[in-house]
Amino acid sequence: MLQEKQPNKSIQVVSNIVDIPGSNRPFAVRRDWLFIGGFQHRPNIDAVLFFAKEIYPLLSEHLRDAKFYIIGDKPPAEVAALATERIVVAGLQRDVRPFFDSVKLSVAPLRFGAGVKGKINQSMAFGVPVVATSMAIEGMELKDQEDILVADEPEAFASALIELYQSEELWTRLSENGIGKTRALYSTEAARKKLEFLFSDEHLRSLERPLSGAEHELVLAATS
């Protein structure tokens, strides 16, 4: 979008970065799933309410003993009201590793919003596979069935979640690929290499060459 509005500028994206602790707990000892995100951000409120009202009822008969953890600062009243024995509104957690080390998967049922979603690359960095909407993965270079599962309609989302929850082969593939993709795109090393390239003499010289009668200007766009 920025490039379309500013065709004579060289716009490069330096994404948000995450630590990559990886996973040392196998599929067999994991259970439950989570959503993580701050609730000052309206898309997160909508996503949780959408999941709880439209998707969660489709899961109860298949995953009766599983719990859904909602993690995030300042959950509003409508989110807090979702709490039951199996829906845990955990609020702000200073240390999220115990959750990521125990759950089988993470959900990102976002229906609007923009930018690289930290909830997704953070989950993948812990080796926790994600089920997400197509909106949630925009701009993240993730492939359905390889790095993540993508579904938009409630029935399809529920079906993908159940399959991932029950299939060790699928879970292991997405867990391993997710760690690899996060390391390649969202690690400190990936950001360092991108910045080294952008400020290299070779790249800066290329910006001096005119294109269609105008000179390029380097613009860095950071995502969060």
Language-model segments: what does each one mean?
Residues 92, 98-115, 126-129:
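Acidic donor-binding loop of glycosyltransferase active sites
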Residues 18, 40-43, 115, 149, ...:
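Glycosyltransferase donor-binding loop in the core domain
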Residues 148-155, 163-168:
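Conserved acidic donor-binding segment of nucleotide-sugar-dependent glycosyltransferases
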Residues 134-145, 149-150:
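Short acidic/histidine- and often glycine-rich active-site loop of Leloir-type glycosyltransferases
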Residues 4-8, 12-102:
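Conserved catalytic-core segment of nucleotide-activated headgroup transferases in glycan assembly
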Residues 45, 97, 117, 145, ...:
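Glycine-rich phosphate-binding loop at the start of an alpha helix
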Residues 119-122, 129-133, 149:
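Short hydrophobic beta-strand element within catalytic cores of glycosyltransferases
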Residues 170-224:
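C-terminal amphipathic helix plus adjacent low-complexity
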